[in-house]
């Protein structure tokens, strides 16, 4: 989605990106576990792609620490988003605040404020828990679903209803695209 948005921001359109928040690997997974927050990695990528700031800011937000401390592997942008969510009280407000600082050309919305867990039922009947385990599974996926039904953000429903055009972006069908579409509130 971030590559598409990087190009779309050059056109005279109002962009609203709805971002799946089920990533649970690497820096995002650790932050989700520690702060019980929605995934921030994909949100960071979308924010960077819509940002109207210097290339150095993009490099900073995507920078991952390489150290032997607990910061190892964390992306600066993921830490900033998590901090903003803590400061403002929720992820949506944290994204909005950081978006103003970074002069975004568009709006970024998390699908949900919930710390969701994506599940997959494989064709062989096994159940796989967690987005990064699903992408690493060697079996064919039959269906994906959430461990607990998420509450879709009201702003997401409003944005979908008011949209002139809805574009489904490139990405993994089962771990990036379908997680937004398996929510009944989104489909309605």
How does the language model describe each region?
Residues 15-20, 188:
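Short internal beta-strands
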Residues 22-139:
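Electropositive, gly/pro-rich neighborhoods at or near active sites that engage anionic ligands
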Residues 3-14:
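A short, Lys/Arg-enriched amphipathic alpha-helix followed by its capping loop at the start of a domain
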Residues 1, 18, 171-175:
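Short glycine-rich anion-binding loops that position phosphate/pyrophosphate groups of nucleotides
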Residues 1-5, 25-28:
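Short N-terminal binding/cap micro-motifs at the start of the first secondary-structure element
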């Amino acid at each position: 989605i971030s590559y598409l948005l990087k190009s779309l921001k050059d056109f005279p359109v109002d962009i609203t990106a709805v971002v799946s928040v089920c990533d649970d690997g690497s820096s995002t997974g650790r932050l989700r576990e520690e702060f019980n927050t929605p995934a921030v990695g994909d949100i960071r990528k979308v924010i960077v792609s819509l940002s109207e700031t210097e290339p150095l800011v993009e490099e900073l937000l995507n920078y991952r620490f390489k150290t032997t401390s607990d910061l190892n592997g964390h992306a600066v942008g993921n830490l900033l988003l998590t901090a903003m969510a803590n400061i403002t009280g929720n992820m949506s407000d944290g994204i909005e605040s950081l978006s103003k600082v970074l002069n975004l050309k568009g709006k970024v919305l998390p699908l949900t404020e919930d710390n969701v867990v994506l599940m997959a039922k494989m064709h062989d009947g096994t159940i796989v828990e967690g987005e990064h385990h699903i992408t690493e599974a060697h079996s064919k996926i039959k269906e994906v679903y959430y461990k607990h039904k998420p509450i879709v953000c009201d702003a997401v429903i409003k944005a979908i209803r008011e949209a002139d055009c809805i574009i489904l972006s490139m990405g993994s069908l089962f771990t990036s695209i379908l997680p937004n579409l398996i929510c009944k509130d989104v489909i309605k």
